[in-house]
Structures are given as structure tokens and as C-alpha cells.
């Protein structure tokens, strides 16, 4: 890309390398380039760096954060003046006991080295001024107002500026004398209402948050005692304006004392050169009228003495009022200081009371929480004990039921064994009866004596020791007569427990266990089960 030489009053024109491209594409590329080339004075950290200044930069973006660059970086945060001041104040928070000592070195091109050049002509140029002042040092920030015929410039050091002022002031240029004096420094402020414990270092650090500070001093009297005032010189006018704004709108404290500093613009007083004779307008009538009489003393009782005395009385009255106002101001300051200390003590006391109340509330809360935990632990222990007791009772009940079930099963088994033995005995008895009564059945005629064979059997008693010594009597006598022969109706009553078993001989046949003697079928017995119950 071809770049021409820079013009004196503006940047050089830049040749556009996209001129040979189609118009829509060229417009899009220019738009993207303008978006990526925006630079901001108070920009945040954005994406890729911007190496060139965009001539068509929109002024509305000066206080905005930087956008993301070609690398698609995130947009930087909005950093305005409040954010910068608060960030610097955070670094100063805390004790300021051991501040480093300031190095008193003269700053090059400071605001104190700025000269005012007046009574110029409209054809003056910057090259001419630089050529005129270059023998006295380096020149910077030359500004010319051709309409009002004055200019400003900075010389590197104060001594060089004073030498240039002394040599060039009153020099003739195009039949007009040049007027040179030190320009009023708009970057300097006066700080008042300072405590006796504010030093040059603390003043420098305190006002450095508003901008770069070149010089900060505390004004002292002839005994070296601080007067409660100081002077701060900034490198830029924006720093001084920022300090004036913040200290006027807010209360800015430099120490622990609740005594805010008061910031005012600094009125420059020239105590070096003063007002020379060449600065007077000698052609005016007032000048000639005032210079008709020279220095003299007035005679007592004269007209001059009378009015001279009145002027002195008025000045004395001013001085008295000024001193009275100063004393009153001092008394009010002491009174306010005492009130401030008392209010500060009360505030600290109330803060301690509030902390004590909070501690008591925390103690009560912790005590309540501890009591709640203890109560919950007791309730949990009681519930566990009750649950354990219920479990033990349930276990004992289950054990008792198991024992009862076991005893019941043992009784059932014993009864079943007894019933089985009784059944076996009855079966054996039936078999014996069937074997011994066969002949009696055949020999019976009509005389009801056919059962004689059965009488031979007689009456038998079976004693069972295993069934609790039960006596079982079985009568084998045939009461049927001739028609029945050897068949008998035998009514047997089976006893379980401690009952007796017997035969009924009269009445109709019983249905307890009626079975023919010659019937050996044992499949239809209904007294006990044949198979043993399993447990």
C-alpha cells in the first residue's frame, strides 16, 4: 500500500487498495475495515490489536469498550471514569503509615514551563516560533491563534523557559514588541481544609487517582508548620477537572479524620517578575494624572492626611473583621471536630452494641439448635428403645407360639400313635374273632344256641399300658338267637382320652363300627386315618 508524505495540518491521504474491485464488494470490505479499526480512548481489552487509526471514527464510540477483533475475542468491559477512579482507590485502601519518599526531579515539558507569546501578527507560523525559541531548548505543543495574534508553547525545562522569557520579552518583530510571560496553568489546583498529618507524599498518592500528577506540595509557614493547604499539578487538564468534579460532588477524605478536602482552581501569582514599567500603558491620561506627584508623606491635619487616615481605618476594620472571622472559623472547626469525635465514638459504640446483639442472637440460636438436637436425639433414642422392646416382645410371642405349636404337634403325634395302636389292636381282635367263631355259626339251629362256639371265647380284657392304662372290655357273647346264627351286631364306642369302651347288648344294632365278621375289607374304616401325619 502506497502512503504519501504527511501533510502539515492533517494525516496523509491513503491510497485504497480495493479500488479495482467491484463496488458492492468494495463497500462491504470498507465497512468491515472501519468496524475493526475503531480505537477508543477508554477502551477495554478486546480482540486483536488495531494498528491504524480510522479517520472516519464515530465519536459516539469514544467511551465504549472495544469490540472483538478478527480473532473473535470477547468484547471488553465498559471502563468509564468512575470505574478507573474506584479501581485506583482500592489500591490505596488501608494504612498509609510508610509511604515512599518522593523523588524531586523536574519533569520535562511540564505545565509550569508553558509560555504565552502575545502581540504577534496574523502571519506568524509554527516554524518561525520554533526557530525563535529553539536556542533555549526543545519546543513542544506549539499552538497559534492567528485571529487574536497570540500563541502558546512549552519548553523542556523551567530554567530554559525563564531564560527565554527574559531574553525575548519585548523584542521587536515587524515593528511590534513581543510580550512573553508564563501561561496560567489550568492543570494546577489548590487543596484546602487538610489535616496536619497530610504530607507531600500522601497528597501526591491521594490525587494520583484522578490522573498523572507532576507535582504535589503542602504550603507551610515560616516555621515549617503546615497551613492546611496544598498545590497539585497534573500532567493533563482532564485530571484537574476530574479532581474538581469528584471533590465538589462528594466528600473525599485523605486520613481517618472525617474532614473532607476542598478543591479550588489555582490562581497563579507571579512573584518573580511582577509588573515592570514596560507593561504600563503610558499613552493614557490616567497614567499621566497618577504620575504627576511622586512619593511623599502627608502633613498632619491636611486634606491628604484626613482621607489617608480614612483609608487606613477601613483597612484596619477589614483586618479586624478578617481576624474575627478567622477566629470564629477556628472555634467552629474545633467545635465541629469535638462533635465529630463524639459522633464517631457514639457510632463505634452503637456498632459494638449491634455486634453484641448479633452475637447474643447467634448464641440463642445456637443454644436453641443444640436443644433441638438434644431433643431429637432423646426422641430418637426413645423410639429405638420402643422399637427394640416391640421386637423383643414379638420375638418372645413367636417363640411362645412356636413352643405351643411344638407341644400341640407332640400331643397330636402321641394321640395319633395311640389311635394307631388301638386300631392295630382292634384289627388283631377282629382277626381272632373271625378265626374262633366259624364253627359256632354252622352249628346254630333255632334254639338260639347256635353261637355256642362264640361262648367258648369267653370275655377278654385287654389292658394297654401305653394308653394311660385304659381298660378295654370286649364281650364276645352272641345274643342274636337262632335267626342270626353266628352274625352279631356289635356296637363299639371308641374312646379317646380317659373314657371307657364297651359293647351294647340290647337294642338295635349300633352304627359306630358295624362290620360283618367275615368282612376283611379294611379300606372303609372311619375311626382313624391309616397313614401317619407328617410334620
From Swiss-Prot:
The keyword Cell cycle does not apply. GO terms for molecular function: RNA binding. Residues 1-80, 346-411, 429-535 are annotated as: Disordered. GO terms for biological process: mRNA export from nucleus. Residues 27-42, 50-64, 486-502 have a biased composition (Low complexity). It comes from the Eukaryota. GO terms for cellular component: cytoplasm; cytoskeleton; nucleus. The keyword Glycosyltransferase does not apply. Keywords: Cytoplasm, Cytoskeleton, Nucleus, Repeat, RNA-binding. Residues 65-74, 434-459 have a biased composition (Gly residues). Residues 521-535 have a biased composition (Basic and acidic residues). Residues 113-185, 187-268 form the RRM domain. Pfam families: NOPS (PF08075), RRM_1 (PF00076). PANTHER family: RNA RECOGNITION MOTIF-CONTAINING. Component of nuclear connecting fibers associated with the transport of ribonucleoprotein particles from either the chromosome to the nuclear pore complex or their transient retention in the nucleoplasm. This is Hrp65 protein. It comes from Chironomus tentans (Midge).
Amino acid at each position: 500500500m502506497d502512503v504519501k508524505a504527511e501533510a502539515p495540518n492533517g494525516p496523509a491521504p491513503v491510497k485504497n487498495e480495493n479500488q479495482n474491485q467491484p463496488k458492492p464488494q468494495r463497500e462491504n470490505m470498507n465497512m468491515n475495515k472501519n468496524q475493526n479499526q475503531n480505537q477508543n480512548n477508554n477502551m477495554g481489552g478486546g480482540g486483536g490489536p488495531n494498528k491504524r487509526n480510522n479517520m472516519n471514527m464515530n465519536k459516539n464510540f469514544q467511551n465504549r469498550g472495544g469490540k472483538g477483533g478478527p480473532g473473535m475475542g470477547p468484547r471488553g468491559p465498559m471502563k468509564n471514569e468512575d470505574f478507573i477512579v474506584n479501581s485506583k482507590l482500592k489500591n490505596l485502601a488501608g494504612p498509609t503509615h510508610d509511604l515512599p519518599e518522593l523523588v524531586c526531579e523536574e519533569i520535562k515539558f511540564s505545565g509550569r514551563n508553558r509560555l504565552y507569546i502575545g502581540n504577534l501578527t496574523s502571519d506568524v507560523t509554527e516554524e518561525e516560533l520554533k526557530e525563535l525559541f529553539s536556542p533555549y531548548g526543545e519546543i513542544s505543543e506549539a499552538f497559534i491563534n492567528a485571529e487574536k495574534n497570540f500563541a502558546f508553547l512549552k519548553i523542556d525545562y523551567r530554567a530554559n523557559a525563564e531564560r527565554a522569557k527574559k531574553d525575548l520579552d519585548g523584542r521587536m518583530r515587524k515593528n511590534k514588541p513581543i510580550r512573553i510571560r508564563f501561561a496560567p496553568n489550568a492543570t494546577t489546583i489548590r487543596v484546602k481544609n487538610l489535616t496536619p498529618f497530610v504530607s507531600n507524599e500522601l497528597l501526591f498518592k491521594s490525587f494520583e487517582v484522578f490522573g498523572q500528577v507532576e507535582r504535589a506540595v503542602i504550603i507551610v509557614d515560616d516555621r515549617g508548620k503546615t497551613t492546611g493547604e496544598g498545590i497539585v499539578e497534573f500532567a493533563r487538564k482532564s485530571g484537574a477537572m476530574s479532581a474538581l468534579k469528584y471533590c465538589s460532588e462528594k466528600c473525599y477524605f485523605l486520613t481517618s479524620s472525617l474532614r473532607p478536602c476542598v478543591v479550588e482552581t489555582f490562581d497563579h501569582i507571579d512573584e518573580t517578575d511582577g509588573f515592570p514599567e514596560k507593561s504600563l500603558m503610558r499613552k493614557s491620561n490616567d497614567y499621566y494624572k497618577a504620575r504627576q506627584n511622586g512619593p511623599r508623606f502627608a502633613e498632619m491635619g491636611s486634606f491628604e492626611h484626613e482621607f489617608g487616615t480614612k483609608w487606613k481605618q477601613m483597612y484596619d476594620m477589614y483586618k479586624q473583621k478578617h481576624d474575627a472571622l478567622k477566629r470564629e472559623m477556628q472555634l467552629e472547626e474545633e467545635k465541629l471536630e469535638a462533635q465529630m469525635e463524639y459522633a464517631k465514638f457514639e457510632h463505634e459504640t452503637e456498632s459494638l452494641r449491634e455486634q453484641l446483639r448479633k452475637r447474643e442472637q447467634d448464641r440463642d440460636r445456637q443454644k436453641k439448635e443444640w436443644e433441638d438436637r438434644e431433643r431429637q436425639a432423646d426422641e430418637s433414642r426413645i423410639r429405638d428403645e420402643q422399637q427394640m422392646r416391640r421386637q423383643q416382645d414379638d420375638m418372645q410371642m413367636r417363640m411362645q407360639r412356636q413352643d405351643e405349636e411344638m407341644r400341640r404337634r407332640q400331643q397330636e403325634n402321641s394321640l395319633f400313635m395311640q389311635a394307631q395302636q388301638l386300631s392295630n389292636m382292634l384289627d388283631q381282635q377282629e382277626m381272632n374273632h373271625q378265626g374262633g367263631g366259624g364253627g359256632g355259626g354252622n352249628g346254630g339251629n333255632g334254639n338260639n344256641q347256635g353261637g355256642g362256639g362264640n361262648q367258648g371265647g369267653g370275655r377278654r380284657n385287654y389292658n394297654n399300658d401305653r394308653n394311660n392304662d385304659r381298660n378295654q372290655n370286649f364281650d364276645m357273647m352272641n345274643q342274636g338267637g337262632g335267626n342270626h346264627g353266628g352274625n352279631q351286631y356289635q356296637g363299639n364306642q371308641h374312646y379317646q382320652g380317659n373314657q371307657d369302651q364297651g359293647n351294647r347288648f340290647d337294642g338295635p344294632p349300633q352304627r359306630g363300627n358295624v362290620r360283618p365278621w367275615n368282612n376283611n375289607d379294611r379300606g372303609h374304616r372311619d375311626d382313624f386315618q391309616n397313614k401317619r401325619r407328617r410334620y
